[in-house]
UniProtKB/Swiss-Prot annotation:
Originating organism: Paraclostridium sordellii (Clostridium sordellii)
SUPFAM superfamilies for the chain: Sigma3 and sigma4 domains of RNA polymerase sigma factors
Gene3D superfamilies noted in UniProt: 1.20.140.160
One Pfam family from the record: Sigma70_r4
DNA-binding region coordinates: 143-162
GO BP term (any one): DNA-templated transcription initiation
InterPro entries xrefs: RNA_pol_sigma-70_dom, RNA_pol_sigma70_r4, RNA_pol_sigma_r3/r4-like
Region: Sigma-70 factor domain-4, residue numbers: 122-169
Assigned keywords, A-Z: DNA-binding, Sigma factor, Transcription, Transcription regulation
Record-linked CDD domains: Sigma70_r4
Entry GO MF terms: DNA binding; sigma factor activity
Descriptive protein name: RNA polymerase sigma factor TcsR
């Protein structure tokens, strides 16, 4: 591996072809992240991230005069981006599967969009709160019906419902 510090410095001075050398140095790492991800565009996503990372690289810091610190910095940044992209991809897949479930129930587009927005709004509630909110607003059940179904008191359902609404109010504001 040639001097990474010099390659980054040359790239920042205008030698555009140096970015290709830097990407080649980290190609095995990018391939590893690609293999470990179920997201098919992970390598290109991380390559684009590397362009931004190198553009904003803090070469003026003294600790980045040695390659080992630069390599570690880039590795950690790529790993964090890998985790972030994977989480986002999983979230998108989850929403897509929810959309598929709703679509199977013969809902029209506006109901589908409303459902996705509704699920996004209640994502920060506890499972019990989500369950009660869904039953009240999606299934249109009364609190007494929910209490019989869940074998809890109507007051407990009401209390959980009000607590969930307060949480949602705080999240929105």
């Amino acid at each position: 591996m040639s001097n990474l510090y010099e390659s980054i410095r040359k790239y920042k001075c205008g030698y555009i072809e140096e970015i290709l050398n830097i990407l080649d140095m980290f190609d095995p790492l990018l391939n590893k992240f690609q293999r470990n991800s179920c997201y098919e565009d992970m390598k290109s996503e991380l390559s684009l991230f590397m362009f931004n990372l190198i553009d904003n690289f803090p070469l003026e810091k003294d600790c980045f005069k040695e390659d080992k610190f630069i390599i570690n910095y880039i590795y950690k940044a790529l790993k964090n981006k890998f985790i972030q992209v994977n989480k986002l991809h999983q979230k998108i897949k989850s929403c897509e599967s929810n959309i598929d479930i709703v679509a199977l129930n013969n809902c029209d587009y506006s109901n589908l969009l409303s459902f996705v927005i509704f699920e996004d709004i209640i994502k920060d509630l506890t499972q019990n709160e989500k369950n009660i909110i869904r039953k009240i607003y999606l299934d249109r059940l009364r609190e007494s019906e929910i209490s019989r179904e869940l074998n809890i008191s109507r007051q407990a359902v009401n209390k959980t419902h009000l607590r969930a609404l307060e949480k949602l109010k705080k999240l929105i504001n």
